[in-house]
Regions:
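A short, amphipathic beta-strand motif
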Residues: 19-26, 50, 85
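Extended beta-strand-rich segments in extracellular/periplasmic secretory proteins, especially
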Residues: 195-254
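Surface-exposed, low-complexity/disordered segments
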Residues: 86-218, 263, 268-384
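Short, acidic Ser/Thr/Gly-rich low-complexity loop/linker segments typical of extracellular
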Residues: 42-51
Length: 384
């Protein structure tokens, strides 16, 4: 087989209460993914099916998603609610006008960056889910709970120092036994987290920007577009908090008009290329006044052509920061940050995974794990 690539917990002030709920759009009744649920200590997200588990440890729980009205509720009220929660949409944003380079509000964002984002060493507790699919079918699922230490949040890759302390892991995958089949490697921890830290400062020489559009009474949105047609400058948007000029949401994806111009790489009898990528991030303010990346999702699609067939690999890396700015003195790095993710080995802790509250396995994931043993021609790779 040929491979190619592209806690120490602070004491709680309140007794924890475990809650499982389902969140939908109040109008369409469709499930909402990536809804942020947090209290003073903990953060989590809804999964693709709209479900979440949450260990409440404070007196107020906030449930929020940009474009929807924020819901604040006590743990007791949340437990009394029915299984389904409804979020009501806010009014639709106004239409945009393209104005060119350097809108004033973006200049304000850059001037306030040192005030809004950590620029000295800090530690965060995180949960990372990695999913690899081949032609729409699951190949690998990996969930990691750990801690990350960085010298600063944003900057060029060469300027960011990053280490990891992994605490818990569960991974499950299947691998084709045919030695001539290809195997797509996942990114390393370092590479994934550097993607998350790379998109705040956009070069005015390379991008045009739309005029700000109103999202709600405290947020405006700016779209960005590459000035020149190339395959490495993407399109996307920034959502800006107009009270402190922080960025609360960022997105960037491949310029669809340039997909056909993306070059192919070749290795032996295989040629491949990244034909799609998308990065979405949401930022929150912590009690220390600094913003952190509360959640992020990086998706990639890789086309692979071998002698027998054409394959599409879809990869997703979903991040949740479960505790921002945690205790730095207890951080102990224990893994190689440059190692490929699925090659990392941390023993499976059944008790932890039965009680943890981050990104529940979707129905499709559970079916994949249950039925994988019935697939002929594949070997199973798992730590549980």
């Amino acid at each position: 087989m040929k491979t190619f690539a592209l806690f120490l917990l602070t004491p709680f002030l309140y007794a924890q209460q475990l809650t499982k709920k389902y969140i939908v759009d109040g109008q369409t009744k469709q499930p909402l993914s990536s809804v942020i649920i947090h209290d003073i200590h903990n953060y989590t997200l809804t999964n693709e099916d709209g479900y979440f588990f949450f260990h409440a440890s404070g007196d107020t729980i906030t449930i929020k998603l940009l474009g929807y009205k924020t819901l604040k509720i006590t743990p007791e009220q949340l437990n009394r609610e029915k299984d389904t929660l409804f979020l009501d949409p806010k009014p639709i944003e106004l239409s945009e006008v393209v104005v060119g380079s350097n809108p004033e509000i973006l200049s304000q964002v850059y001037r306030k960056a040192l005030d809004n984002y950590p620029n000295e060493p800090f530690v965060e507790d995180f949960f990372l889910r990695c999913v690899l699919k081949l032609n729409g079918d699951f190949l690998k699922i990996e969930d990691i709970a750990g801690r990350v230490k960085r010298n600063k949040l944003l900057g060029l890759s060469k300027d960011i120092k990053i280490d990891f302390q992994l605490l818990n892991m569960r991974k499950f995958g299947i691998e084709n036994k045919d030695k001539y089949s290809e195997d797509l490697a996942l990114l390393s921890l370092r590479d994934v987290f550097l993607w998350y830290s790379s998109l705040l400062f956009l070069d005015y020489q390379r991008f045009n920007f739309s005029a700000p559009t109103i999202v709600d009474d405290t947020h405006k949105k700016i779209n960005h577009f590459p000035k020149n047609n190339n395959f490495y400058d993407g399109v996307g948007h920034l959502v800006i908090n107009t009270k402190d000029y922080s960025i609360v949401e960022r997105s960037d994806k491949i310029n669809d008009a340039m997909i056909d111009k993306i070059p192919w790489n070749k290795k032996l009898w295989v040629k491949f290329r990244t034909s799609y990528y998308s990065l979405k991030e949401k930022c929150e303010s912590s009690s220390n006044g600094k913003y952190f990346i509360a959640s992020a999702c990086l998706t990639q699609q890789v086309e692979v052509h071998n002698k027998a067939q054409k394959n599409l690999y879809d990869i997703e890396y979903q991040l949740v920061i479960t505790r921002p700015f945690s205790l730095i003195s207890t951080f102990k790095p224990n893994v190689n940050a440059k190692a490929e993710l699925f090659k990392l080995n941390i023993p499976y802790n059944k008790d932890f995974w039965e009680k943890q509250n981050q990104l529940p396995l979707t129905d499709q994931m559970q079916a994949f794990i249950k039925n994988a043993h019935n697939q002929k021609g594949y070997r199973i790779i798992s730590n549980f």
